[in-house]
Design a protein with these regions (language model features):
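N-terminal basic, amphipathic alpha-helical segments
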Residues: 1-128, 134-136, 323-329, 338-347, ...
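Active-site PLP attachment segment
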Residues: 69, 283-317, 328-332
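Short glycine-rich anion-binding loops that position phosphate/pyrophosphate groups of nucleotides
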Residues: 110-113, 174, 233-237, 297, ...
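Conserved core of the PLP fold type I
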Residues: 135-258, 270-272, 276-284, 290, ...
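Short, structured coil segments at secondary-structure junctions
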Residues: 207, 284-285, 370, 402
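Residue-level detector of anion-binding/catalytic polar loops
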Residues: 210, 261, 404-405
Length: 446
């Protein structure tokens, strides 16, 4: 055995790793006696502390056994079927000095605008979290009572929902809310919009349920065997369509006939800048709709907070499971959001983002209209443009070469043939947006 003093790995760790390798290779077998720590240290030219630490570590892991007055022995032999050569460690990444291979900016649908003028309020909220006394034991599985009260007030004011705070369950985001709901539904497939939110379809599949494609641009009159339908009626993801009132009523009637629930993902609902936001679909039938909301688009995705409102029977089932599993949103994030709500910070953030989106959306439309067809109204933090797949890929590749990632509409589709580009404009600067549009339209103009 040899030790490398120039390596960044500590000497005891090197020695322990080499002994493990000798056992795994079969060179050392159960019952073999190792040199004393003093003798091995002398052979290797290191201090005795190095060999003692290595032996102690290997003994703690169950490879070696120290017998008083006798020495140190191997206690573990390589099981049959285990490779005699340990897995090679993954090479550490080297410092990158050239331009990254991947785009540096993302024009996606999930990154909102964050007004730097609001940073002081954001920091103040987290300072308050840092000095607040944490709860002793597990907190309420529904979430902080004060936060639920603030959310109930806000959802009543902005989404038309008349809620008691106890009807709200705070989650770690929309997908967490869906994960909480799926085990409580009766067996059967779940209908998900197509094209639609990819994470929703993948989550349904993860829970062992079949996904039925629900055409996002058609009126739904029959849900078939589906036990639930996942929709984004306020601003369909990714087409941007607002579900008309007649289509909402038709979907609810289809759900009643199928004894299914409608899962309303209230995605991007607050960012209408042409008309007032459409009230939540849950206002039409609280007994049939499971409402999912998130702070990811109005605050930041990394806050990892959302909320769920379900009919009473499902509410109790979800709450019971979350009580047993101690599932729930992180307490610091809940406290921070509570402060942001109480201080009026969230309202300011929404107004600021809405103004920015209202200015950027027409710029995107002006650039793209000569080459593509807008799929929905100008609303929210992205717009979707229909065009042939070869043209969309060519434009996407040009944007990548310029350092920007733009999503293809086809990546959201499962069975529909819709193709085009989904252009987000929340998470970039004005200058970056102009650069990206120049790259996109330059490719489309060829």
């Amino acid at each position: 055995m040899t030790l490398d003093r120039t390596s960044g790995e500590p000497l005891p760790a090197q020695l322990a790793g080499q002994v493990r390798s000798l056992v795994l290779s079969g060179t050392l077998a159960t019952g073999d006696r190792l040199p004393s720590s003093r003798a091995l240290a002398a052979d290797l030219g290191v201090s005795r502390a190095v060999t003692e630490q290595a032996y102690d570590q290997l003994a703690a892991e169950g490879w070696l056994e120290a017998r008083r007055g006798s020495g140190t022995y191997v206690t573990t032999t390589r099981p049959s079927g285990v490779t005699s050569r340990p897995t090679e460690p993954t090479p550490r990444p080297t410092r990158v000095t050239s331009r990254p291979a991947q785009p540096t900016s993302r024009l996606d649908t999930g990154t909102p605008f964050f007004d730097p003028r609001l940073e002081p309020g954001w920091r103040r909220a987290w300072r308050e979290v840092s000095v607040a006394a944490p709860p002793r034991g597990y907190d309420d599985p529904r979430g902080l009572a004060e936060l639920r009260e603030a959310l109930a007030a806000r959802l009543g004011r902005t989404r038309g929902l008349d809620l008691h705070p106890d009807e709200i369950i705070v989650t770690a985001g929309t997908t967490d809310g869906l994960r909480a709901l799926l085990p409580e539904l009766r067996p059967g497939p779940v209908a998900v919009e197509d094209p639609g939110y990819r994470a929703a379809a993948e989550t349904v599949l993860t829970y062992g349920r079949e996904v039925i494609d629900l055409p996002a641009v058609e009126t739904v009159r029959d849900l078939g065997a589906a036990v639930a339908a996942y929709v984004t009626p306020a601003h369909q993801h990714p087409l941007g369509r607002v579900m008309p009132a007649a289509d909402r009523l038709s979907l609810l009637e289809a759900a009643r006939r199928a004894d299914a629930v409608v899962i309303e993902d209230d995605y991007d609902s607050e960012f209408r800048y042409d008309v007032a936001p459409v009230p939540a679909m849950a206002t039409l039938d609280r007994g049939r709709v499971v409402y999912l909301g998130t702070a990811a688009k109005s605050v930041v995705p990394t806050l990892r907070l959302g909320w769920l409102v379900a009919p009473p029977d499902l509410h109790e089932l979800i709450l019971r499971r979350r009580t047993i599993t101690h599932a729930g949103a992180a307490w610091p994030s809940q406290r921070a959001l509570l402060t942001l709500l109480r201080d009026g910070w969230l309202d300011k953030a929404v107004r600021s983002a809405r103004r920015v989106y209202a200015e950027r959306a027409p710029r995107v439309a002006e650039a793209m209209t000569p080459y593509a067809t807008l799929a929905g109204p100008l609303a929210g933090m992205y717009s979707t443009w229909l065009l042939p797949e070869p043209d969309a890929r060519c434009a996407r590749d040009a944007a990548r070469a310029a350092g920007f990632e733009v999503n293809l509409l086809s990546t959201y589709a499962r069975s529909t043939g819709l193709t085009g580009l989904v252009i987000g404009f929340g998470g970039v600067t004005d200058a970056e947006l102009d650069q990206a549009l120049t790259a996109l339209t330059g490719a489309l103009a060829c």
